[in-house]
A protein has these predicted regions:
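Bacterial Sec-dependent N-terminal signal peptides
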Residues: 1-24
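Conserved functional acidic sites
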Residues: 21-271
Length: 271
């Protein structure tokens, strides 16, 4: 009797799991050769957390600013995402995707401890927290040291209505919260021997900097992923500067990645 009862419970639960959206490495890693257009739209609030949410973005206006995002391959284990004159370097290891550096005409950054972007699989309620440590230079005149903490959470799921009125179901929202401490110094102030010191990630030191420093930056990025698409269909980014404990909003911006421009419906992917 217990076995029959267990089978009934499992049978009733299966439709819930089948309907749940989930991100995985084979379907959601950036892929060489892909090209996307990010259409900037009226800034949108992300809305509530939880299940069965409805995100109605049908009234937002597409603005003139559009950005092309392309993915190319470097070697056998690095993907480069290029957008807005910046190249971001990504590396997949095990079940995770990391950012290992980025560069543009003024700034070059490389991570001693890469920044975790995803730990797959990602499903409603999953959350992972990690630390990062990076260094580089600005205009080859100033040294930059970036240290911080990121938390990636699948905090909501539901249905999304696009600016063109199309409705997407089985949508999963991923929230990435980054806390960043930045220090800049003149290049001659850093001894050459520092670059040869073995790197050791100090989590306690990062926590101390974020809690005690008079100024630090926080960014929150919400991305909506729809079933059948490798890349997000909507994105909102909010940047806030904290000065002596007081928050100053830096900017909020939103983008839509129109599904009919992605051309990457997963059931027809060749890889």
């Amino acid at each position: 009797m217990r076995k029959v009862f267990y089978l009934i419970i499992v049978g009733l639960s299966l439709p819930l799991f089948i309907q749940a959206q989930m991100l995985n490495m084979s379907s959601n890693l950036p892929r060489k050769g892909d090209r996307l257009i990010k259409h900037q739209v009226t800034p949108c609030e992300p809305g509530k957390k939880g299940h069965q949410q409805i995100w109605d973005f049908s009234k937002v206006n597409l603005q003139e600013a559009n950005y092309e995002l392309t993915y190319t391959e470097q070697g056998t284990d690095t993907i480069i995402g290029t957008e807005h004159r910046t190249m971001y370097y990504y590396h997949a290891s095990g079940d995770s995707l990391f950012c290992i550096g980025y560069e543009n005409p003024t700034t070059f950054i490389t991570y001693q401890k890469p920044e975790l972007l995803f730990a797959f699989p990602v499903f409603q309620g999953s959350s992972v927290t990690d630390y990062f440590d990076a260094s580089g230079n600005y205009c080859d005149q100033l040294n930059i040291r970036l240290r911080g903490k990121s938390r990636v959470t699948a905090d909501a799921s539901g249905m999304l209505i696009l600016p063109e009125g199309d409705t997407l179901r089985k949508v999963l929202r991923i929230c990435t919260h980054r806390q960043i401490h930045q220090k800049m110094t003149r290049k001659e102030e850093i001894p050459d021997s520092l670059g040869h010191t073995p790197f050791i990630l100090d989590r306690d030191s990062i926590e101390y900097l974020l809690a005690g420093d008079s100024i630090h930056l926080e960014t929150e990025t919400w991305r909506w992923y729809a079933d059948g698409y490798r890349y997000p269909v909507f994105e909102t980014v909010k940047s806030t500067a904290y000065k002596f404990g007081k928050a100053y909003e830096h900017f909020t911006t939103s983008f839509v990645y129109l599904p009919d421009e992605q051309y990457y419906d997963l059931p027809y992917d060749t890889d």
